[in-house]
């Protein structure tokens, strides 16, 4: 057992500790930045200095530090996070590593994301569920291309709180002038993100030495702000949750017996109360909320982020993938929209090819009609392209085979975000964030002359029998 938990148990007792722990707010944050900026070391330092490491974990780190560590005689705290063998041997982060810890104020889930450009898709995956981005900058190198790249992606994915940590201050002799120079450079860049709602905190620290991570440092006496952990403890994310209209994607129809039929899911945005009138989409049928059921008992209301089961006063047809909204909602139904797309596979995104598209709990079929531009996310410049490559980000027109109720991503991430799934391999090949919705009168459906079966058969033949020189049917009839 780690010492922080032991101390709290001794003070409160097991039941009081568990009750207090249950109702703490949860903050999800990711660490990102350029290669070797010290992301994994920072997380290791956070865990170590907040007394969240078990004795056997610390012993293992000491042993591994002698073999593959990069910090000399001291334990390499980055090894607490870099779990893959390839990561330890190369001294880099490849996959997204998740760690959990808590303080007396808050619970945390950390996503340690890779800094290398070829793992940008991993970083986007880690950022998609986070409230805060901790962006590390090496005090010696300043703002680099990958710093801009990760800031752009975090902003694109709806993260509204940035904590910019200028790391390795010990290597620039804790220079205040160097810190101010980097701070000015980053704030100038952040204006190009065109997001007036961004909350940016910038602070100096040394993850290796532990300066200003959990505790204030005499070496940084000129810095009058809070250490990193206090900043994270005090970030206000409750205001973000309460915004927006009620959205409830149905994940599961719960029918344990003939007397109960409920619809389980997580409230994506807004709130709902017993007695509120709702509309089930796409059917458009109305009813009122009879009960809000949880494992701990019924609630009178539920807010964004809560997993609940709703029962209705009327028996109406609702299934997995349907969406519940309030009756006065102005949610738009469409089969065409513009979206920023992050491409995640070696084979580039090609307009005209069909993919399975999953939005919240709903699965449908769609295609890219056109690529407006790709973004150079190092300079934020836009340029024309015929296809999106691996790790490419661009604005595209997307068409669906059916009408779906959607939001813009900035209004609701769950009903405004989606993934592309390759129909042959079932591999997730891309992720999208809806920017603009088209009116149904303006929308153009996918070519009705081609069935989904014909598209898949044609793709299989072209993949496995290339010597037949079969043409792409979707392009021939598009």
UniProtKB/Swiss-Prot annotation:
Residues 112-115 are annotated as: G3. Residues 24-240 form the tr-type G domain. GTP binds at residues 33-40, 112-116, 167-170. GO terms for molecular function: ATP binding; GTP binding; GTPase activity; sulfate adenylyltransferase (ATP) activity. Residues 167-170 are annotated as: G4. Signal peptide: none annotated. Keywords: ATP-binding, GTP-binding, Nucleotide-binding, Nucleotidyltransferase, Transferase. Coiled coil: none annotated. PROSITE patterns: G_TR_1, G_TR_2. Pfam families: GTP-eEF1A_C, GTP_EFTU. SUPFAM superfamilies: EF-Tu/eEF-1alpha/eIF2-gamma C-terminal domain, P-loop containing nucleoside triphosphate hydrolases, Translation proteins. Transmembrane segments: none annotated. Residues 33-40 are annotated as: G1. The keyword Calcium does not apply. It catalyses: sulfate + ATP + H(+) = adenosine 5'-phosphosulfate + diphosphate. The keyword Zinc does not apply. Pathway: Sulfur metabolism; hydrogen sulfide biosynthesis; sulfite from sulfate: step 1/3. With CysD forms the ATP sulfurylase (ATPS) that catalyzes the adenylation of sulfate producing adenosine 5'-phosphosulfate (APS) and diphosphate, the first enzymatic step in sulfur assimilation pathway. APS synthesis involves the formation of a high-energy phosphoric-sulfuric acid anhydride bond driven by GTP hydrolysis by CysN coupled to ATP hydrolysis by CysD. HAMAP family: Sulf_adenylyltr_sub1 (MF_00062). Heterodimer composed of CysD, the smaller subunit, and CysN. NCBIfam families: CysN (TIGR02034), PRK05124.1 (NF003478). This is Sulfate adenylyltransferase subunit 1. It comes from Aliivibrio fischeri (strain ATCC 700601 / ES114). The gene is cysN.
